[in-house]
Amino acid sequence: QMISKTMIFEEVALALQGSDMTQEQIRQRVEDTLKVCGLYPFRNWPISALSFGQKKRVTIASVLVQQPELIILDEPTAGQDFRHYTDIMEFLRGLNEQGVTVVMITHDMHLMLEYTPRALVFCDGQLIADRSAAAVLCDPELIEPAALKETSLFTLANRCGIAPAEDFVERFIHEDREVRTHGC
């Protein structure tokens, strides 16, 4: 919906048109960005030939080509199946490891637990928490005022008498990720 060009290369280069960069500098920057986004092999393809997840990466590449220090994404995995959800989140994790700050707005509590080292919670326009995702989602004093949902892992920890629940949730998410990633 935010794509305005037909071809991948043209779409990513669009933000640099009219800058003081030469065409060669633009070409190099776009190619470098497409490599980071895993789209370089498709650089001369029409955008219509891409999957939904690849199209999302094109829109992200269109921002990254400008070399921002920060990107803000609203529901980056909305409408994607689990495979594409995982692909886009691993891609964003890689960007973050390369020094790009990634801020996500999400209602997906599993995404929040698995992929964010830090969660900011706002209520009535005020910041009410700045902690780990597990700490936020295991704090009944935050869940209600921020209209968050108690996770099933927090409920399980409480019902089984596992304390602190936050540690249990973090360990479970870590183990789940290990099994999916390495099969063990």
Spans of model-derived segments:
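Conserved ABC ATPase "signature" region
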Residues: A13, E24-F42
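Conserved ABC ATPase signature
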Residues: P46-L50
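Catalytic Walker B motif of ABC-type/P-loop ATPase nucleotide-binding domains
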Residues: I71-D74
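H-loop/switch region of ABC-family ATPase nucleotide-binding domains
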Residues: T106-H107
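A short, surface-exposed alpha-helical micro-motif characterized by mixed small hydrophobic
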Residues: M112-E114
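Conserved beta-strand-loop-alpha-helix hinge in the C-terminal portion
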Residues: Q126-L153
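ABC ATPase nucleotide-binding domains
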Residues: I143-C184
